[in-house]
Amino acid sequence: MSGSTPFQMRLVHLDLKGAPPKVSYLSEIFPLFRALGANGLLIEYEDMFPYEGPLRLLRAKYAYSPSEIKEILHLAGLNELEVIPLVQTFGHMEFVLKHTAFAHLREVGSFPCTLNPHEAESLALVGAMIDQVLELHPGAQRLHIGCDEVYYLGEGEASRRWLQQEQNSTGKLCLSHMRAVASGVKARRPSVTPLVWDDMLRDLPEDQLAASGVPQLVEPVLWDYTADLDVHGKVLLMQKYRRCGFPQLWAASAFKGATGPSQAVPPVEHHLRNHVQWLQVAGSGPTDSLQGIILTGWQRYDHYSVLCELLPAGVPSLAACLQLLLRGGFDEDVKAKVENLLGISSLEKTDPVREGAGSFPGSNILALVTQVSLHLRSSVDALLEGNRYVTGWFSPYHRQRKLIHPVMVQHIQPAALSLLAQWSTLVQELEAALQLAFYPDAVEEWLEENVHPSLQRLQALLQDLSEVSAPPLPPTSPGRDVAQDP
């Protein structure tokens, strides 16, 4: 299958608010991105950006240094990947508003997600963030200013008072802040075009949107990560945006991080269907209105949620989706090319450790993560809840009272020790692989969430077995000092 893609720009989204890769791993993976068909990156730095001055407290423990940002941009340039930085400026501001120093700028005092658009200090804050990001991205042509999922907008005290005035609405409030931020970007760097996520714009009346001045300032990114995307609805939305005056639009799909907050390995078929439907949207919508597509790879649903699929685990899905976009479909030839590029035997494999992990950077992480996600909990469950000797002779009742028929120890202990040894070996290998690609806090978090609970259940069983099967201490007479000579 061959064909020209309607998406001239194909950007891979790097969501750094969880498990940010080390620069050394990015140096290995960027050439693969290019080989797969990407020509740009959307980098959502969040707390990994090296903010300075009063913003320094936003930095994560292992935030990139300015020199590392320059190295990332250099690596991207070597691989002909345009970098678009993303700075959240309205919703999803938890990484800023969680700090006491900025808590007074929350739209709703108890929730750190949304910025209060009425405070002049709010605009100064996002302006300072944008200044620092643009300073370290001197060649940036575009800047994504977020503005998605602005939850609880209109529910703060200042907003409630403002909304009591005639002709005011949450839509008007949203557009006003978006316009102010985008105008600030253009004032700072006239050559930079701001991008925004489109969800806060979708339901606004056309006349309000057209009259707001926003269409002359930003390019909206229409996002939908579902496998049953409403193609006709998206085409109508594109037509609406064009009528409102937006000259250029973008699409956003997903290659990972969109099928559950604790997903470990992306379901490739889901993501392929999502991209097939985006191709249908591009083919049916206004001609040449789509600048490109952003393949999002979310790493957390928000700042406080657990980690979803790690970047190496998402590479096969990303590869399949990029090649589908380039070739206009996903037949056996395209599938074979993806498998060849990644050095894997099959995209559908269920046991990469046995069938071959692949040759792409981080392929060993994918293989080991797949083993853990498919088999760790189920194997421990099988022992603790499916083994007749455990359920019949060493139940929670028995364990609490330290009771067991001595003969049963030999039926339970060897199996538990063998299972623990098997998983301990694999987990050591996984931890070593993770440490090469990620910082210590991400390694610790992933293992604590996905590995330790099951291993601790196994270790607790063995500890209880050890205690119950230990030889009893010799009895002593009540009140008699055992150390006393007869």
From Swiss-Prot:
Superkingdom assignment: Eukaryota
Keyword Hydrolase found: yes
SUPFAM superfamilies noted in UniProt: (Trans)glycosidases
Active-site residue list: 149 (proton donor)
Catalytic reaction annotation: Hydrolysis of terminal non-reducing N-acetyl-D-hexosamine residues in N-acetyl-beta-D-hexosaminides
pH dependence of function: Optimum pH is 6.7.
Consequence of changing residue 92 to A: Decreases hexosaminidase activity
One Pfam family in the UniProt entry: Glyco_hydro_20
EC code: 3.2.1.52
One GO term describing the cellular component: extracellular vesicle
Signal sequence segment: none
Regulation: Inhibited by O-(2-acetamido-2-deoxy-D-glucopyranosylidene)amino N-phenylcarbamate (PUGNAc). Inhibited by galacto-NAG-thiazoline.
Subcellular location: Cytoplasm; Nucleus; Extracellular vesicle
UniProt GO MF annotations: beta-N-acetylhexosaminidase activity; hexosaminidase activity
Job description of the protein: Has hexosaminidase activity. Responsible for the cleavage of the monosaccharides N-acetylglucosamine (GlcNAc) and N-acetylgalactosamine (GalNAc) from cellular substrates. Has a preference for galactosaminide over glucosaminide substrates.
The protein's name: Hexosaminidase D
Organism, scientific name: Homo sapiens (Human)
